[in-house]
Amino acid sequence: MMQRYAVGIEFCGIRYRGWQTQQAGVPSIQETIEKVLSKIADEPIILHGAGRTDAGVHATNMVAHFDTNAIRPQRGWLMGANSQLPKDISIQWIKEMNTDFHARFKATARRYRYVVYNTLNRPALLHKQVTHVYQTLDVDKMMLAARKFEGTHNFETFRAASCQSSQPVRHLSHCRLTRHGRYLVLDIQADGFLHHMVRNIMGCLLEIGQGCYEIEHIDTMFAAQDRKAAGVTAPADGLYFIQAYYPEHFELPQHPLGPHWLNLPDEIPNI
């Protein structure tokens, strides 16, 4: 009998070309995990993720699911997979699910954090795990600007030219920027994200922080509905997929949002 499992995955995206399986020879998170699970199950496994992260993007709790005929205790799946996965990928939890659960299509919202290391000297130990910005930033202005993205908007200007989504309207339930010592953290949640959307919003906020334009210019960007009207795309290095949300009846395990070395609260910043 086919059994569906949900899993929570943590990964460092530095060595991978994103979540989605690529052409032969190009490493991806999805394919790497599928190979290990297929070996444990002794049958082909297809993994369905809640999101599709870009090359170099990280995750603290990417929710995914797979179906299998193999009978294994949950601890067996967890320990078996983690003993064979590369050290930069780890399954944090696993749970048996009914077949009405789908990691992608049943998700009601997704949440990211983008981490900027804002000091003169670049960090060595956090190489490619944060985005280093050495310039002095007007953080108060950036915090106000971030709130402009909340609500329902047409994000045509803030998606990649190659984005394949059929429509660019998204609802952001929150978009908050906070400072934690040397770190700036953008915490952003939406019903769905477009390709490069978070990185383009972060790029806009960084330019505002550097005095390139005023907060009100965001309205002009939205009105233009043209990618060329916005600023640069922020690097993938500082971006973390931290959570996907589902109806409560699925009872998925609670997992700290992370990134864990920052020790941030899970609650939405109240600013």
From Swiss-Prot:
* Keyword list, A-Z: Isomerase, tRNA processing
Q: Which domain of life is it from?
A: Bacteria
Can you provide one Gene Ontology molecular function annotated for this UniProt record?
A: tRNA pseudouridine(38-40) synthase activity
| Top class in the EC scheme | isomerase
Pfam families (alphabetical):
PseudoU_synth_1 (PF01416)
Q: Where are the transmembrane segments?
A: none
Q: Where does substrate bind?
A: 112
What catalytic activity is recorded?
Answer: uridine(38/39/40) in tRNA = pseudouridine(38/39/40) in tRNA
Location of the active site? 54
Task: List the InterPro entries hit by this protein, alphabetically.
Answer: PsdUridine_synth_cat_dom_sf, PsdUridine_synth_TruA, PsdUridine_synth_TruA_a/b_dom, PsdUridine_synth_TruA_C, TruA/RsuA/RluB/E/F_N
Protein's UniProt keywords contain Transferase: no
Q: Name one GO biological process term.
A: tRNA pseudouridine synthesis
Q: What is its EC number?
A: 5.4.99.12
Family affiliation: Belongs to the tRNA pseudouridine synthase TruA family.
Q: What's the subunit arrangement here?
A: Homodimer.
Q: What does this protein do?
A: Formation of pseudouridine at positions 38, 39 and 40 in the anticodon stem and loop of transfer RNAs.
Q: Identify this protein by name.
A: tRNA pseudouridine synthase A
UniProt source species: Acinetobacter baylyi (strain ATCC 33305 / BD413 / ADP1)
> What is this organism's lineage?
Bacteria, Pseudomonadati, Pseudomonadota, Gammaproteobacteria, Moraxellales
Q: In the UniProt record, what gene is named as encoding this protein?
A: truA
